[in-house]
Amino acid sequence: MEEEGIRNFKELRAKFQKFNAAPLPGPMRFPAGVSRKHDRGSTQPAQDLANRKCLSSHHHQTPSHSSTGVSQPLKNQTLKSAQGDELQKTSSSSGTPEKSTVCPERDFQKAAVPLDVTKSRAKTSNEEKGMTLSSFRYKLWNWEKVSSQNGEMSPAPLLTNGGIKTFHFEGQKTMGLAQDKPEKSLKATGAQTLPPQSHSMAQRKSPVTSKASSVSLPPHSRKSTKSPATEGSHRSSQCQPVYECELDSLVPEKPQSRHCRLPKTKPLPSIETLGPPPPKPSKPPFVNLYAFHRLPATVTKTPKEETMKEGPLSPDSAELEEAHNYDTTISYLRHSGNSINLCAEGESTEATYEIEIEELQKPWRSFFLPELSPRPKEEENTMEEKESWESEPLEPRKELHPSRPPKVVVYKETPGKTQMAGVHEDRRSVPAGNQEAMTDIMQNRLFPEDVTLTRHSQDKSGYVEALEVTKETPSPSTIRSSSSSEKTYDAVECSREDVRKWDFSSSFTSDSEENCEEMYEDIYKAKNDDPKTEVAGRTALRKLQQIFRKENVVFRMKKTKSKEIVSNGFSVSLPDLGPRSQDDSQDGIIYDDVDTREKESNDEDKVKTWKTKFLIPKGKKWGKGSQGSKSFSPRHFFRTKKQKLEKNRMEKEEKLFRERFQYGKEILVINRAVACASNSRNGMFDLPIIPGEQLEVIDTTEQNLVICRNSKGKYGYVLVEHLDFKHQG
């Protein structure tokens, strides 16, 4: 079978090479050994066969210029194969579906035999295909051109696996029937020659693809896109089951039918049929949601809601919360006078608690009565750092209460010279009796040695806290500016318990300004300016303890004798009390309230003026300076404030009276009267009166009206009949 196929292919190739226009031999017939199992064309009626012959003869009209030798065998060969193919497919479509589906499955298994034959043929023809294609393509191109003009025939390229192109022309219906069935069955025995194979391959090409390729592309560029396996299956036998529904779907669509299938546009209905448009809907009612926005701020949270994480707040609630926290922060800044609770208060600034006025007075009380337990050194440093930034927000609040009595701390470093450390407003407006009790507490309990309260020498209603400083020789390095003294005061304020720890007589000075906030042990070491006399820490502390004991003894003697001298009235200035030991003279201890003989006259005058008010007994003190003490009492403060308000209101009413009445005279009270009846006139210039109210007569008019002023300072006209002048004082 393979030798016969190869022999036929060689004949075809030799004829194309040698005789370019020579006709092909007659149609090749199948050998006797090949059985046609699926060919049932003999059972078809004669009428159906005649119709297909007419149709195939109509499609296969050859052009006039082609040679008769070539066209006649091709026509006969294609006609016979087309007839056989039509008969097979008609019989298969009329049969049962069960039998027809068995045929492609059985024939698909036999597709490998022609595929190998085709590959062997392609290998032998690759070497000689160049010369044979040129003349063949030219003739085929003329053939396709004529067929495309008639509109009844379409070309179909065929590409073998090796690259050989063979083209066959077939009718439109025959090719459409075999479009979607690539699996074809093979014959059981025998071999098939090249012209029937190429003819059967041409039948299975799509009409649309062949028509597009014939019009747009030249003949030499048309190539088959099918795979070798598909081509091998196309060269199989002619048995292929096709149903009637598939036959209808395989018929190519015409452009007219496609155009008719487009969706039809439906015109819009007219305005008359639709009628008038519907009325516009009314606006919704206005609803104020401001109350609902404020509601979450006041509603109390349940325990379950408190455990949940808080999401992003709305802008309104966020603003309310920030404002509330800001007020709370201010209130805690007021509450931060107690240095012991600074850390706890700094952490609780985000809380939303209200602080009452009584709680604001607690730091002032705790300042005079702090706990006597000593603090560790680490807590000291943290308190000092807290005090430094706490003092900044408290500074703008000093201007809010200018009438409060300030507290002044004074450091006596050289005899007769004082320096203001800073003014602080820890003291609130307290009655005179409470102030006296607090001074007693300070003198007896907290600061029994060196802290006393006095009035300022210039009588500016302030309190001076005098701290004693022991120095061997006064030097310029000990004199500090006001800024350095403020820092020193902050350090002293933060470490008052350390002052009690060292018996309240320690030195608060050092060689440099940086040492003012250091710990007291370092200050004690740096007490002497001479570096040669510096001693180790323990020995220095022992000496200081001895000095403090001597100071305590001398201070007690001084206190008792000063009371006796002042009570007897012998002298105002105190002499040098008691003999001092040699150690005291060497240390050069100088007391603030002791007048030494080594002072200059100017210093003596300053100290005397300061001591005259410091050493006055309590009874004489309040009797002599009662006016000054009244200014500190809250009753006197509110009384003066009320008087100022009344004065301002009177001035305002007077100004309004002059503008309204055009009164340019001096306002003088000429008489006083009591209203006996209510005023019946209710004009702009009339003064409303109440029976029994006392009025001051300012001026009279031409009519029976007088200008009066009531107790509130308002002016207006009053009838003379409504006034009674008998009760005047």
From Swiss-Prot:
SUPFAM superfamilies, alphabetized: SH3-domain
Q: How does the record describe the protein's post-translational processing?
A: Phosphorylation is required for its function in T-cell activation.
Where in the cell? Answer: Membrane raft
Q: Which Gene3D superfamilies match?
A: SH3 Domains
Domain annotation SH3: ranges? 668-728
Query: Per the annotation, which location comes first and is thus the protein's main one?
Result: membrane
Region annotation (Disordered) ranges: 18-130, 170-320, 371-408, 469-490, 576-603
The biased composition feature labelled Acidic residues covers 584-593
Q: Name one GO biological process term.
A: T cell receptor signaling pathway
Q: Which Pfam families match?
A: hSH3
What's in the GO CC field? Answer: immunological synapse; membrane raft
Q: Where is the composition biased (Basic and acidic residues)?
A: 374-402, 594-603
Residues carrying Phosphotyrosine: 489, 591
Q: Where is this motif: SH2-binding?
A: 520-523
Q: List the biased-composition ranges (Polar residues).
A: 69-81, 89-99, 190-216, 226-240
Keywords, comma-separated and alphabetical = Membrane, Phosphoprotein, SH3 domain
**Where does the record place Low complexity bias?**
473-485
Pro residues composition bias: which ranges? 275-284
Q: What does this chain do? A: Adapter protein that plays a role in T-cell receptor (TCR)-mediated activation of signaling pathways. Required for T-cell activation and integrin-mediated T-cell adhesion in response to TCR stimulation.
Q: How does it assemble?
A: Interacts with SKAP1, LCK and FYN. The phosphorylated form interacts with LCP2.
Protein name as it appears in the record: FYN-binding protein 2
